[in-house]
């Protein structure tokens, strides 16, 4: 029993600490981004402005009355197409990099960020 608990913790930690996700899409076409967060985790999508891990994040979706809607920014253009499922126009973010924040908790008190790198077909 102790071994199963230990194995569960190791599996969760290993899955939770993914740093980067590489995905392929056709440039300037709508693309449903694969969520790299582990199953049963919550996710929020951002653009990280700058290269540092401590760089500010721009949220791409907002919760409105039980549904998620894309936030449109002048500097980003129409990058986010839909939030459920998370869909973007396949292009490099103008201000930085695409990041998904994964958390087991709905309030995101503990989280881990995964950078999503797009490979254009």
UniProtKB/Swiss-Prot annotation:
PROSITE patterns: SARS_ORF8_IG. Disulfide bonds join 25-90, 37-102, 61-83. It is found in: Secreted. Changing residue 119 to I: In strain: Delta/B.1.617.2. GO terms for biological process: negative regulation of interferon-beta production; positive regulation of immunoglobulin mediated immune response; symbiont-mediated perturbation of host defense response; symbiont-mediated suppression of host anti-inflammatory cytokine signaling; symbiont-mediated suppression of host antigen processing and presentation of peptide antigen via MHC class I. One of its GO terms (cellular component) is extracellular region. Residues 1-15 form the signal peptide. Homodimer. Interacts with host IL17RA. Interacts with host IL17RC. Interacts with host MHC-I. This is ORF8 protein.
